[in-house]
Every structure is written in structure tokens, then in C-alpha cells.
Amino acid sequence: MLSHNALVVVAAGHQAVLFRNTAKQGIELEEKERLSPKHLQDESQGKQPEETTPKDEDEATFAKQLAERLNRMVLQNKVEALAVVADPSTLGQMRRHYHKTLEQKLVREVAKTLTSASGAEIAKALG
């Protein structure tokens, strides 16, 4: 069960959508914000294998930036409970950057690409 006002993050590659659960019981998602990559020339994901493509590196950088944003939100007490729905690659990259406090607030992870899905489809995946 997802608690009232829980933050739900739906991410894939180069985009993420933040929702809040507005239902007192069950899941009813209200979109709060859409995020896209910041183009930071000096910041990269870190050392990558030689076979990494620029697209892969961009996606890894976005996943890192998203995780850092979520870490800040958690550390500023803006998140009491968190659910993350992301494609497996993005989810794996994000996990590498989770703060310990974020991990404590994390109530659900779903490894699926649902950035184009409706709120009802996302709620079903979280169910």
C-alpha cells in the first residue's frame, strides 16, 4: 500500500515525471512535475567502459542527476515515502546514487518503462 502524499517517480532514459499519491486509501496519482536532462558540460556519470555510447552516457548522467534531486528532496524532509518506477537500466543507474536516507524512505521499486503510461496504469504497476 502506498501512503497518502507518497512521492512516485516514473523515469526512463531522458525523462521523468513526479507524482503525489492524493488518495487517503489506495493509489490516485496527481502529476506534479516533468523533468528532463540538465545539459551540464562539466558533470558526467563518471568513468564508463569504452563501448559506452554518448546516448548511454547521457542516460546515466540523467539517472544520476535524478537520484541526486530525490536525495535532496528526502534530506529536506519533502518526502515521507517514495516509489520509483523506471526502466531497468535507469533504475540500476539511480540505485548507485541513492543516499542512505532515501533508501529508508523507499517503499517500492518497479523495473518497467511507464513514462508514457496513464496514472491508472502506473497505479496498477505499483499495486
Regions found by a protein language model. Give the residues of each.
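Terminal alpha-helical anchor/extension segments at protein ends
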Residues: 1-127
